[in-house]
Structures are given as structure tokens and as C-alpha cells.
Amino acid sequence: MAMQKIFAREILDSRGNPTVEVDLHTAKGRFRAAVPSGASTGIYEALELRDGDKSRYLGKGVLKAVEHINKTLGPALLEKKLSVVDQEKVDKFMIELDGTENKSKFGANAILGVSLAVCKAGAAEKGVPLYRHIADLAGNHDLVLPVPAFNVINGGSHAGNKLAMQEFMILPVGASSFREAMRIGAEVYHHLKGVIKAKYGKDATNVGDEGGFAPNILENNEALELLKTAIQAAGYPDKVVIGMDVAASEFHRNGKYDLDFKSPDDPARHITGQKLGELYKSFIKNYPVVSIEDPFDQDDWATWTSFLSGVDIQIVGDDLTVTNPKRIAQAVEKKACNCLLLKVNQIGSVTESIQACKLAQSNGWGVMVSHRSGETEDTFIADLVVGLCTGQIKTGAPCRSERLAKYNQLMRIEEALGDKAVFAGRKFRNPKAK
């Protein structure tokens, strides 16, 4: 089924920054997709095209990307008469038309907007749910509901507190279904709010970009202690484990790391990667930490490799791998991590996202699907995680509509699957293992 019309516009994301939305029309109707954007971005990500006109949205407008769709990509696709079910052909055509390594001609935000809309239209054309269409594109027979990783304490570049590490997450791995995981996560979240309020006052329960709390604490183990207390208070010590996203590239300074990077710089307090690794090992020993993302800088390969060889938890590459097959292959070769963080806008098309996921899975890695800190009400990644069977998703706290949009869609998908629904649970790192 051919595309009839493609129209892009500038809308606002959850942080009040412009982003790209695309409407694609076929005989089956209108299919809409919106593109997310990140705050802590890896230097190897595909290029998000911003206008740079400081007199408008402080330079963050996306009218150039919108124009690239409306004047170039859209007309070229309509002329080519490609079918919306041919995701790979459509994506390949756009990538070749762009012709750059990092999609800098049109912008990854332009190409991805169209790619997502095409995927939604393709599902409708086949008369199947989006998650089933994505599973077909990936060659998956199975469908798996993921364990949600709720980011309930925010630090790093996502919050105005002193905390260096960016996300402290709870994973209800002991739940029996996705719906139960939502309930457990929400209950722990509310208990955490009470614990923080009692200890630091009401102001400390203000929420960050992703719906988590941002109490003004400096010590990272204090955040872990708060989680441990809230998990106990909610009555789920046997069902909930902890994950972290350190985003260490944000506080990497001249080969070392600054755990107080939001204060005036003082090289005397910078620590080595090895020392930082020892701190993580103490977290793993004292708390139920099962997953650490970006523990070191995106180019500190040697420290990643030596750390992975000494722990048996999940080590996730985000800034390290940026959903890019070349970086993933490098990380596999160097044995730097054992899980990929999958963000569709880091690579910039549905096809390449699926390829990145399959490359990681074929090397025995886990895959965690992820939102960005600047989100929209688009729910594409909820269907994506089910179709790709990755078993884990992080899309914020159980708070703020742009986060709940994804979680609520996952509850609907589980409901639609009925007794065929499979929840990853404790097998979240490799849900397909029998």
C-alpha cells in the first residue's frame, strides 16, 4: 500500500523543547509519530538537527528537520511509491538519500519521524497490532512483556541536586505479570515519596524530567539506602531489585571521574576508573543492584573491560554503544559490556534499531529498550519492546503522562494477548532462554 501524503510539524516535548511530529496518510488512515530527544547524549549518536536560531526556542527549533521532511524526504518517498510494509526498503532509501554517516544532512530526528510513522502504517496495512508487525520485521515468533525499570531517584544531568549518578531504578522482577509489576512499582514509588518527605522535607519530593524524585543528596549510596528502605516499607524485598544508570561520561574529567561534578571543579577529588569500579562493587555487595548502565566514560574501554570481567551483574552500554552496530561490534570484541540500551533516536531508523537489537542478542547480550528524557505522548517503544522480546524497558517513573503513556500501552498489550501473554520476570536479561 503506497503512501498518499507525508506531513511534518514542530511540536513540544515533555521539557518544553521543540521536536518533530510526522503524519503519514495511506488509504487506511492517518499514522502519527513523534520523536524524543535526550539530555545526556553520547558523542557517537546520530545527529539530531536543531535550527540554532537563538532568537527562537533558544536555538532548539526543529523547523529545518521539518522542512527536510516536507520538501525533500516526503516528496521523494511518494514519488518512489514504496509500500509501508517494506520498512527496510523505506529506511534504506531515506538513509541513502541522506548519504552521511550520522544522518547529519536531514537529521536523525527527520528520518526517524518518518520511519516510525511508516512502521505504524505498515502494521495497519497488514491488519495486525504494531507489536506483532515489529516482531515480524525482527523475525520473532514470540512476544514478551518486559520488566519495567522505573527511574525513581534522579541525579546527574537530569536533576538540580548534587547527586552525580543519573538514575536509580527499581525493577519488580518478582511480579507475575506486567500489570502486577506496575502495581508493585507504583506502591514502592509512593512509599519512597513518604520516606524522602520524612527525611528531607516536602521540597525534596519534587520530580525530575523522568518523574523520579530529586532529593538534594550528594552520596550515591544514600540514594540506594532510600530505595532499600522504600522497598522494605512497601513489603517487596523479595520481588524488587535495583538498577542504576550512572551516565559516567557526564562527570569524566581528564581521564578521571568527579563524583561532585556540579560543584566548582577541584582536580584533587577526582578518582580513577578503578576506584569508581570498587565503589560499584560495594554497591553490588550491600544492595540488590543487578544492573549498572554506563559505569564509565564512553571511550574508557579498558576500564569497562576489566570491570565486566570481575562482576556477574548486567552491565549496560548506552553512551558506549549508542544503538550503533559498529560500536556494538567493538564492545562485543572488547568484552566491555553485556547489555545494549536501545534508543531508536540514537541510530535514527526502525530498521537499524532492529538490526542493533539482533546483533546484541546474537552475541548473548541482554537488551533494554529505553525512552529519552525529553519525551512525547508517543507509545511506539511499548510495542517495540514486546515485538523485540528484550524483556526489559526503562521509560521513567510511574509518574508524568509522557512516561505513563508507554506503561499504560504495555498494560493494554498484555490484556490483548490474554493467556498468551508472557512476562519476562526474573529472566529479564534473557527472556527467550528456556
UniProtKB/Swiss-Prot annotation:
Please list the residues that carry the modification Phosphothreonine: T72, T205, T229
Q: Which InterPro entries match?
A: Enolase, Enolase-like_C_sf, Enolase-like_N, Enolase_C, Enolase_CS, Enolase_N
Q: Please give the chief subcellular localization of this protein.
A: cytoplasm
Tissue distribution of the protein: The alpha/alpha homodimer is expressed in embryo and in most adult tissues. The alpha/beta heterodimer and the beta/beta homodimer are found in striated muscle, and the alpha/gamma heterodimer and the gamma/gamma homodimer in neurons.
- Identify the metabolic or biological route this protein is part of: Carbohydrate degradation; glycolysis; pyruvate from D-glyceraldehyde 3-phosphate: step 4/5
* Phosphotyrosine modification, residue list: Y236
Q: Which residues bind substrate?
A: H158, E167, E293, D318, S370, H371, R372, S373, K394
Pfam families for the chain: Enolase_C, Enolase_N
Top-rank taxon: Eukaryota
The cross-references to PROSITE patterns, in alphabetical order and at most eight, read: ENOLASE
Q: Give any Gene Ontology cellular component.
A: phosphopyruvate hydratase complex
- List keywords of the entry alphabetically: Acetylation, Cytoplasm, Glycolysis, Lyase, Magnesium, Metal-binding, Phosphoprotein
The chain residues annotated with the modification N-acetylalanine are A2
Where, per UniProt, does this protein localize?
Cytoplasm
User: Cofactor stoichiometry and binding?
Assistant: Mg(2+) is required for catalysis and for stabilizing the dimer.
Keyword Magnesium found: yes
What general EC class does the enzyme of this chain belong to? lyase
Picking any one GO molecular function of the record gives: phosphopyruvate hydratase activity
Family indicated by similarity: Belongs to the enolase family.
Oligomer and partners:
Mammalian enolase is composed of 3 isozyme subunits, alpha, beta and gamma, which can form homodimers or heterodimers which are cell-type and development-specific. Interacts with PNKD.
| Protein name as annotated | Beta-enolase
Q: Which organism is it from?
A: Oryctolagus cuniculus (Rabbit)
Give me the gene this protein comes from: ENO3
